[in-house]
């Protein structure tokens, strides 16, 4: 049995047809983590007994013929920025060392209700404020393809564990690239949803007007399955969009419609753009054309101000969000 290269959708199909049990799936990944993660440092908290207990509950429901969602029994790794009642939430910081949340974040509660066992919490830059997963109190996370290179950040642990086959799915957060960049560095798929599509309740804030929770996986189909679980309106998040989950996975099976892709001239012609990155973008655009897409060049002259604007907004909001910790006594002082 080799599951480390399987997609979440493949594992789901094997679970539904009872070729394998949820407990066997979780045990497989726990054993693989025990062998390989010491050299990667993708996980910072693991509770094998909890993971197996969650998997056993799914197996019991399936044995009784209870209705289950498509990801029931498919394990997932969680960035250590989301509040969980049964594992520490440390944000990669000594300040929060040993902190146990009294409540689950909304995304966590949705995954729990969907029957998804969690394999553990993954490494990140401290408070998600970085792009290399090197500023964590737990040490740096290594890139599975070359341990001398960075996994990216701040969701580097989530990207690395999927790339290394330690988990079929992972949850990250993205403020200024923290899902997309490590996914690219580690060769997996990552998705930052539109702001408000996924609840931020129970996510330790970095920059509140930019933060979003999103999935990381081997395939786009897996991302869609995960989005069907974690997205949707949440009254506990004032920025949550008041609309139902659109059915991401169902849309993948629909006949493709024509679509337009805008290529920002100022970005593709930027002197600072690495030639290899430019070549990869051009190659991707060719694939999109083959899929029926209309590629159109557009001009956004203000794009030169994007990064400076980010470095005004994000640090200001981060300063405000971190100030709420002042006077609290969780970890080291």
Q: Which role does the model predict for each range below?
A:
Residues 1-52, 290-292:
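An N-terminal boundary/leader segment
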Residues 10-13, 17, 123, 269, ...:
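Serine-dependent amide/ester hydrolase catalytic core
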Residues 11-17, 77, 95-100, 211-218:
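Short, well-ordered beta-strand elements within core beta-sheets of diverse protein domains
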Residues 22-26, 56-59, 247-250, 273-300, ...:
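Acyltransferase
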Residues 29, 51, 104, 223, ...:
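Residue-level signal for inorganic ion chemistry
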Residues 70-110:
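Enzymes and membrane/adaptor proteins characterized by extended Gly/Ser/Thr/Asp/Glu-rich
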Residues 103-233:
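Short glycine/serine-rich loop segments
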Residues 192-279, 283:
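A short helix-breaking turn/cap at a secondary-structure junction
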